[in-house]
């Protein structure tokens, strides 16, 4: 495993981040495919043994049970100072309504720390933009969380670049804790972030930690081949259903490059992301140890300029999806 500074912070993270949406009690969330605790723990332990030290969860994943499972596993398999733990606030959890008001943020971080069994998180991210709360209230509350020692740093997730620029400017003007990461939707078949968000992040020293780096499994198998999870994944369908013809050509080129390198499609798709300036750690979501073992090899894979061009050439602009 290789490690990199997380933007302009003192944190050093593995080049792959373990996404923890996969972990959660199936009867407590919206996704029947999540792994219960007895299946999650071996995978988390295997990730640690493979060199991953960066874990991304959220208050809302499986109604909080993801944080509970991840927290217990990390306490058992690693020292607190050996791991970088990220969680999120915004979506509804139990009787805590959706939103980013001061009251919601302060309650959410306390609830997350209780579920995780930790005194602090390394990174607290806002999961989406809250149109019902003044952004100044949100940013000042996040600063309060950092000053209280409950989060070392703060980050943001999918939003318009103009919104992120506004937030960064307000943080600088008011001396508030600044966003150090952008958790955005970015992969070989969705590259709209390259237009504005990625350049903005590079100018401001913000680390990019992409979600859905394998397009929710679409970049791991022949185009059109399906799985039970793909069939039931309504959110995934909303992300990719309008661009399948163009995406199929990219998938075909991905298969060609993978064959040239004697690598898996997933390894090549991740290696492409890792080659992008500003990308710190794509967030992967394996559900089996053999999948994780395959993905871990991506950090040692180097693509030639010709291979990168072959992967990128077919891309055409896509509708902006994943947030409002």
Regions found by a protein language model. Give the residues of each.
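Active-site groove signature of glycoside hydrolases
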Residues: 114-131
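Short, acidic/polar
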Residues: 33-47, 100-116, 164-169
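Beta/alpha (TIM)-barrel catalytic core signal, keyed to glycine-rich beta->alpha loops juxtaposed to Asp/Glu
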Residues: 133-313, 323
């Amino acid at each position: 495993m290789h490690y990199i500074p997380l933007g302009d912070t003192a944190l050093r993270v593995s080049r792959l981040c373990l996404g923890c949406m996969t972990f959660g009690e199936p009867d407590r969330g919206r996704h029947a495919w999540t792994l219960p605790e007895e299946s999650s723990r071996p995978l988390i332990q295997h990730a640690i043994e493979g060199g991953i030290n960066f874990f991304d969860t959220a208050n809302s994943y499986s109604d909080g049970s993801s944080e509970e499972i991840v927290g217990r596993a990390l306490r058992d398999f690693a020292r607190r100072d050996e791991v970088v733990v990220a969680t999120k606030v915004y979506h509804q959890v139990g009787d805590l309504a959706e939103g980013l008001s001061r009251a919601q943020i302060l309650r959410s971080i306390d609830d997350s720390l209780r579920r995780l069994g930790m005194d602090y998180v390394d990174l607290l991210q806002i999961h989406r933009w809250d149109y019902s709360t003044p952004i100044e209230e949100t940013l000042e509350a996040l600063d309060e969380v950092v000053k209280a020692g409950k989060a070392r740093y703060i980050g943001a997730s999918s939003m318009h670049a103009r919104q992120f620029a506004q937030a960064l400017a307000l943080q600088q003007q008011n001396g508030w804790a600044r966003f150090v990461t952008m958790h955005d939707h970015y992969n070989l078949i969705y590259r709209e972030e390259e237009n504005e968000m990625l350049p903005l992040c590079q100018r401001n020293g913000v680390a990019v930690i992409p979600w859905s780096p394998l397009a929710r499994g679409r970049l791991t198998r022949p185009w059109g081949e399906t799985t039970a999870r793909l069939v039931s994944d309504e959110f995934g369908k909303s992300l990719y259903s309008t661009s399948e013809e163009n995406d199929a050509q990219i998938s075909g080129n991905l298969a060609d490059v993978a064959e040239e390198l004697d690598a898996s499609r997933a390894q090549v798709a991740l290696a492409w992301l890792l080659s992008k300036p500003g990308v710190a750690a794509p967030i992967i979501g394996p559900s089996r140890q053999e999948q994780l073992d395959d993905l871990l090899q991506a950090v040692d894979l180097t693509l030639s300029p010709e291979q990168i061009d072959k992967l990128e050439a077919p891309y055409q602009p896509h509708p902006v999806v994943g947030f409002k």
